[in-house]
């Protein structure tokens, strides 16, 4: 099993050792080089936002400003400047509908997001270093493709895959209570100033983890770490994968799977969470001696797993075809292809590349869209965007020199 490696020594420039508990993390959060590196990580994909452009123009001054905010954010009783203290804003929720689901998202301000990135840069080696290797989603380098490869290896080995169990957590993010997460954090982080900084970030969310906050996904994953290891080590389940709040377990013994689901339900109850009522234990598909196929495929992480192949869920295929038809319609009307739509289409083709759905691609996609042409358009438009961005940056630098 490959465990996610994160070299904090390269990021923060200080020696780092894996420990049971960690101290002096607040000192790291106050360092200028850490704050600057957090900004570089934060700005990816957000360079068009005006507040980010303003911060980048005068980065050194903004780094000192964030440093002052963190230095003045301490528990009551410590001498600080109350005007410079970190004061989070109360956000209005944004409702987003995607893939048939309605999600409530909160968009943090640049200062909030910056401080969250500083916190995560320090928490990442602690959380990712001790995480269960087969927990995927919301960790860098651990997407659905890595989870798909893991389940494929189980099936190819042929051991411990007679029966499967699947379960989801009901409204996971909206039911996580921060006080429960904090108790778990206190065992690992022995730094009251650093914990107070996290407390301030979560001021307006005592009974939920806000979607849209960079800190939320890390704290949510940290909350389920102990349960992951219990399933594998205490219950001795043959195979176990967690994709954020979705559990997929495999074992030859069906009774063990039922006991595992009961244990998961009990532990979730202690954390004030609930398992969905649509949990299931079923026999994995196989061929009988008479040649008749029985059992079911496994549907997890957007993939459909069979003994000899891996397919994609229907709604993802429909989504790919819908975008292909949009691009085809724009080509027929002689309209310009939007860069975001082209990038989204090429990204979704990765699902087809890593599954046995090439025949579907030939019938439904190839006749509508020329993929090579789309890739050339992306390359050309990206060069144009980068050139204009470079020209704008040069103009701003010249203007600032004239002003000086």
Regions found by a protein language model. Give the residues of each.
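Non-catalytic, polymerase-adjacent accessory regions of viral genome-replication enzymes
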Residues: 1-68, 397-401
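Right-hand nucleic-acid polymerase module
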Residues: 1-11, 108, 113, 117, ...
């Amino acid at each position: 099993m490959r465990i996610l490696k994160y070299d904090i020594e390269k990021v923060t420039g200080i020696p780092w050792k894996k420990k049971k508990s960690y101290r002096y993390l607040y000192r790291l959060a106050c360092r200028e080089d850490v704050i600057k590196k957090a900004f570089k990580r934060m700005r990816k994909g957000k360079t068009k936002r005006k507040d980010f452009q303003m911060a980048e123009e005068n980065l050194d001054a903004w780094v000192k400003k964030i440093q002052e905010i963190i230095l003045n954010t301490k528990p009551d009783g410590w001498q600080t400047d109350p005007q410079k203290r970190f004061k989070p804003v109360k956000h209005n929720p944004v409702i987003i509908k995607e893939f048939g689901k309605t999600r409530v998202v909160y968009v943090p301000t640049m200062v909030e997001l910056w401080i969250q990135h500083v916190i995560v840069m320090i928490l990442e080696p602690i959380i990712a270093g001790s995480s269960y290797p087969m927990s995927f989603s919301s960790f860098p380098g651990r997407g659905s493709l890595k989870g798909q490869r893991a389940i494929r290896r189980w099936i190819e080995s042929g051991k411990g895959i007679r029966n499967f169990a699947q379960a989801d957590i009901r409204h996971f993010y909206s039911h996580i209570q921060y006080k429960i997460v904090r108790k778990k954090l206190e065992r690992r982080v022995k730094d009251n100033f650093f914990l107070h900084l996290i407390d301030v970030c979560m001021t307006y969310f005592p009974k939920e983890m806000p979607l849209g906050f960079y800190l939320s996904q890390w704290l949510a994953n940290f909350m389920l770490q102990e349960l992951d290891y219990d399933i594998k080590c205490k219950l001795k389940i043959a195979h176990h994968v967690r994709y954020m709040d979705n559990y997929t377990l495999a074992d030859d013994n069906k009774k063990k799977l039922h006991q595992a689901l009961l244990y998961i339900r009990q532990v979730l109850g202690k954390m004030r969470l609930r398992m969905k009522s649509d949990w299931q234990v079923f026999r994995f598909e196989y061929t009988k001696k008479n040649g008749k196929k029985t059992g079911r495929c496994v549907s997890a992480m957007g993939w459909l797993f069979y003994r000899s192949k891996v397919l994609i869920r229907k709604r993802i295929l429909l989504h790919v075809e819908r975008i292909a038809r949009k691009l085809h319609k724009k080509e027929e009307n002689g309209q310009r292809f939007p860069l975001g739509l082209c990038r989204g289409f090429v990204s979704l083709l990765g699902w087809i590349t890593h599954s046995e759905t090439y025949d579907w691609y030939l019938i439904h996609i190839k006749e509508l869209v020329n993929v090579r042409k789309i890739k050339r358009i992306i390359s050309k438009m990206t060069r144009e965007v980068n050139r204009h961005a470079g020209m704008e940056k040069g103009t701003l630098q010249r203007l600032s020199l004239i002003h000086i």
